[in-house]
Regions:
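A short acidic, Gly/Pro-enriched loop at the edge of an enzyme's catalytic core
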Residues: 101-113
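Short alpha-helix
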Residues: 169-184
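Conserved class I S-adenosyl-L-methionine
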Residues: 1-47, 152
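Short, glycine-/aromatic-enriched active-site segment of Class I SAM-dependent methyltransferases
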Residues: 150-168
Length: 213
């Protein structure tokens, strides 16, 4: 991220909550029918055998959900604590520690990629670069599925489940994100929004599906 201090605070914050995050959110996709449907559709559209990247994977719940349905998944996260938590829980997923702005992956390595509530931690100046980096690691015609909170506000946490943290959650406008995707060499194929589920924070959610062109 553009500001090194900001970058480090995100990493430290997720390191701090990694174990509790992994425990509290285990099995969360059983209560998110739209998320499951979109991920299943992505899996169907990914060339068989092509790996799928989970960018900002946390402890790997989403990556494991895909792996359990036959996908070869690679989870990438900035937080060493999250990567460690994922490796301890999900042997079916390959985990790598890495930055959205400099992904530890080869050009064109992945058939598809997902980034659920990942770009919300980026400095606004870095969003374009992150999208370009996602495009770099995708194969031609590869798909990128994004999820994020809708709006223009920034929510700051200095305490999370009783742990001291220092982290911002940046809400984003779908039209702005779609414009960044198109400028970076993607064609946006789907935009969708939903309200929060009962167990979630009370925010509106957006999903964008884009294809590398």
């Amino acid at each position: 991220m553009g500001d090194r201090a900001h970058h480090d605070s995100v990493r430290r914050s997720y390191d701090t909550v990694a174990e509790e995050y992994a425990t509290r959110l285990h099995g969360e996709f059983t209560e998110k029918p739209l998320d499951r449907a979109l991920l299943a559709a992505l899996l169907e559209q990914t060339e068989p055998g092509s790996p799928i990247a989970d960018l900002g994977c946390g402890p790997g719940h989403l990556a494991a959900w895909l792996a359990d349905r036959g996908a070869r998944t690679v989870g990438i996260d900035l937080s060493a604590g999250m990567v460690e938590a994922g490796r301890a829980r999900f042997a079916q997923v390959e985990f790598r520690e890495g930055d959205l702005l400099e992904l530890p992956a080869e050009d064109g390595e992945f058939g598809s990629a997902v980034a659920f509530y990942t770009i919300i931690h980026l400095d606004p100046a870095d969003l374009r670069r992150a999208v370009e980096e996602a495009r770099r690691v995708l194969r031609p015609a590869g798909l990128l599925l994004l999820a994020f909170h809708v709006g223009e506000e920034v929510r700051h946490l200095d305490e999370w489940w009783g742990h001291d943290v220092d982290i911002d959650f940046r809400f984003l406008e779908p039209a702005h994100v779609a414009g960044l995707l198109e400028a970076a060499g993607f064609a946006v194929e789907m935009r969708m929004e939903r309200t929060h589920y009962a167990h979630e924070a009370e925010t509106r959610r957006a999903y964008l599906l884009a294809r590398r062109i």
